[in-house]
Amino acid sequence: MSTRSVSSSSYRRMFGGPGTASRPSSSRSYVTTSTRTYSLGSALRPSTSRSLYASSPGGVYATRSSAVRLRSSVPGVRLLQDSVDFSLADAINTEFKNTRTNEKVELQELNDRFANYIDKVRFLEQQNKILLAELEQLKGQGKSRLGDLYEEEMRELRRQVDQLTNDKARVEVERDNLAEDIMRLREKLQEEMLQREEAENTLQSFRQDVDNASLARLDLERKVESLQEEIAFLKKLHEEEIQELQAQIQEQHVQIDVDVSKPDLTAALRDVRQQYESVAAKNLQEAEEWYKSKFADLSEAANRNNDALRQAKQESTEYRRQVQSLTCEVDALKGTNESLERQMREMEENFAVEAANYQDTIGRLQDEIQDMKEEMARHLREYQDLLNVKMALDIEIATYRKLLEGEESRISLPLPNFSSLNLRETNLDSLPLVDTHSKRTLLIKTVETRDGQVINETSQHHDDLE
């Protein structure tokens, strides 16, 4: 049985996602061609020829074409040699030429697009090289500059930390000294307060003695007044007695003049008067001496008590002044202590704020370094992706070159002349059933390239029936 199939193919480019990593040394591409042929025993149905090209995972290209074959819609038709229509062959030849022309135009467009894409890739490679050079330069400069800045910042921070530590130690020593002074002053204040209480107790006892002395003096003054009144009364009584005695003496003197023989009473009265005067003078002298002695004693006791009171007042005033001065000194020391504690807290807060700022600066510098590292890694990944795309494009260009060469060689083959067909009269229904199965041919083509050059190419054919 003779069978003939007419097939045509056209290539279309279908771009997938971005190219992934491929091996820079070599890559393999597979071309699978599936051809279906049908025997003339069945209806002359359309035949489909598919060609699938798979390269690196960066892209998938598939070409499909279909050509209309001779078809018989009536199963019982008999083909006769005299009724062959050669216009159908001319139509097929015309369609075949148009298909080949369209394929050439499509291949030319694909070549132009590939050329533009290659130019773009080269431009991107140049830009990538420039960016890599700038990145290396910035990396070298930035690393040294950041390292110097980091070291300088660290030295400054260490110096400030040491200074703050020394200031803190000095302030703590001053605080301890002030605390000791305050404790000593508090002890001294307690002692002074005890002495003040003792002085007040002594002063209270002295006041009681002074009160007792005042009462005794008042009592003595009353006694002196009573004695003075008694002395005045005695003087008055004595004067009256003297007057009476003088009157009696006058009477006796008169009587003496009359009667000379009477006894002399003047001498007796004189003696009595002298006796009374001596007794009165003695009593008066004794009273005056007793009064003077008592008054001297009371005056001495009063002076002594006044001296003790004045001394107690002076001591109390001195103690009060010392207490006030110590209180002022304690208040001043408290203010100084509070000021030093406030300064210490402010220094600690400033130190904490500066330490936090320096930590933020260090963290920011580390983040910048990490960002630069990530950016450098991203540039490297982009460069690697561009290299992978370049390798994939080199593989695709080599594969298209092979396909174009094969297509040109296939196009250059002479077409069969349908006018020379000599068909016998055959009954289509009498064909065996085995011929109704379709024959499938699987072509596996392996192309290995390196740096855009094809170094190995193999093909395998597998036939199976459907």
Curated annotation (Swiss-Prot):
**Subunit (UniProt):** Homomer assembled from elementary dimers. Identified in complexes that contain VIM, EZR, AHNAK, BFSP1, BFSP2, ANK2, PLEC, PRX and spectrin. Interacts with BCAS3. Interacts with LGSN. Interacts with SYNM. Interacts (via rod region) with PLEC (via CH 1 domain). Interacts with STK33. Interacts with LARP6. Interacts with RAB8B. Interacts with TOR1A; the interaction associates TOR1A with the cytoskeleton. Interacts with TOR1AIP1. Interacts with TOR1AIP1. Interacts with DIAPH1. Interacts with EPPK1; interaction is dependent of higher-order structure of intermediate filament.
The entry's cellular-component GO terms read: axon; cytoplasm; intermediate filament; nuclear matrix; plasma membrane
Q: Where is this region: Head?
A: 2-95
Q: Where is the IF rod domain?
A: 103-411
Enumerate the InterPro entries for this protein. IF_conserved (IPR018039), IF_rod_dom (IPR039008), Intermed_filament_DNA-bd (IPR006821), Intermediate_filament (IPR050405)
Which residues are in coiled coils? 96-131, 154-245, 303-407
Name the gene for this chain. VIM
Residue numbers of Phosphotyrosine PTMs: Y53, Y61, Y117
Q: Give the protein name, as stated in the record.
A: Vimentin
The entry's free-text remark on domains says: The central alpha-helical coiled-coil IF rod domain mediates elementary homodimerization. The [IL]-x-C-x-x-[DE] motif is a proposed target motif for cysteine S-nitrosylation mediated by the iNOS-S100A8/A9 transnitrosylase complex.
Q: Report residue spans for region: Coil 1A.
A: 96-131
Q: Which residues carry this modification: N6-acetyllysine?
A: K120, K129, K139, K168, K188, K223, K235, K294, K373, K445
Annotated keywords: Acetylation, Cell membrane, Coiled coil, Cytoplasm, Cytoskeleton, Glycoprotein, Intermediate filament, Isopeptide bond, Membrane, Nucleus, Phosphoprotein, S-nitrosylation, Ubl conjugation
The chain residues annotated with the modification Phosphoserine are 5, 7-10, 25-26, 34, 39, 42, 47, 49, 51, 55-56, 66, 72-73, 83, 87, 144, 214, 226, 299, 325, 409, 412, 419-420, 430, 438, 459
